């Protein structure tokens, strides 16, 4: 399976944010979408998630020798600021999510299977989500997106504000869950992209460029990216 993006364009008034996005993402890989703040990473995600209309180009899935449009339910989108129903307990939230997604989310013998996956402790599973820390809310947001088994998982800087322990847990979870889907992880932190991602893609001046890291040592790789980000910088 491949997600093919062809000549995607998006502008806000006179500001051209996505100039000519042309790239193919492949199943089973984590792509690091690297770019400075304001480069258009969130705009690209909003277009792929069909929250915003594009002004040129298209994107589609290529699988089994054919092509087709991406269905909304095939996309999971994890925001940098977690959005969860704070009036529910964590267990109630999972039950509710499974009820409204019964056709796509398999029912486990116990919800504790899912809590174990993201290392939410037993004493926290029946607490209100409003009492969860930012990191725990982020875990819950990540969990329901993984439960839905989307073909495309968009992660908009989800680890930026997490503490070191939670961030490491989330990185390990993403690596374990990458098979069978296309994962695109946006960040402006170079070391995080290098550590987590299989492929690095640079969003700069409204265009995507794959940066081959296999043939570069760490320092040369950093310098290449920094040089690209400095050119005609905002």
Which residues fall in each region the model found?
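Conserved beta-strand-loop-alpha-helix hinge in the C-terminal portion
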Residues: 207-230
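Helix-to-loop junction immediately C-terminal to a conserved catalytic motif
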Residues: 49
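Conserved ABC transporter NBD signature motif
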Residues: 56-73
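Catalytic Walker B motif of ABC-type/P-loop ATPase nucleotide-binding domains
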Residues: 153-157
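Helix N-cap at the start of a conserved alpha-helix in ABC-type nucleotide-binding domains
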Residues: 164-166
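Conserved structural motif at the start of ABC-family nucleotide-binding domains
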Residues: 3-5, 18-20, 72
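The feature captures the beta-strand-to-loop junction immediately N-terminal to the Walker
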Residues: 34-36
């Amino acid at each position: 399976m491949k997600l093919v993006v062809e000549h995607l364009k998006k502008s806000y008034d006179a500001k051209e944010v996505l100039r000519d996005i042309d790239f193919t993402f492949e199943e089973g890989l984590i792509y690091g979408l690297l770019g400075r703040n304001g480069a258009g990473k969130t705009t690209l995600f909003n277009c792929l998630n069909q929250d915003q209309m594009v002004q040129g180009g298209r994107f589609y899935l290529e699988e089994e020798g054919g092509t087709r449009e991406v269905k909304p339910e095939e996309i999971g989108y994890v925001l940098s600021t977690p959005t969860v129903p704070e009036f529910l307990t964590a267990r109630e939230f999972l039950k509710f999510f499974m009820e409204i997604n019964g056709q796509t989310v398999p029912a486990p013998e116990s919800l504790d299977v899912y809590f174990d996956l993201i290392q939410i402790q037993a004493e926290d599973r029946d607490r209100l989500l409003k009492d969860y820390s930012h990191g725990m809310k982020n875990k819950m947001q990540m969990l329901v997106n993984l439960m839905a088994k989307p073909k495309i998982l968009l992660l908009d800087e989800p680890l930026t504000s997490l503490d070191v322990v939670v961030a490491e847990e989330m990185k390990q979870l993403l690596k374990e869950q990458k098979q069978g889907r296309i994962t695109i992880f946006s960040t402006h932190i170079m070391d995080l992209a290098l550590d987590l991602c299989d492929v690095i893609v640079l969003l700069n001046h409204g265009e995507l460029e794959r940066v081959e890291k296999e043939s570069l040592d760490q320092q040369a790789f950093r310098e290449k990216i920094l040089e690209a980000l400095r050119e005609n910088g905002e």
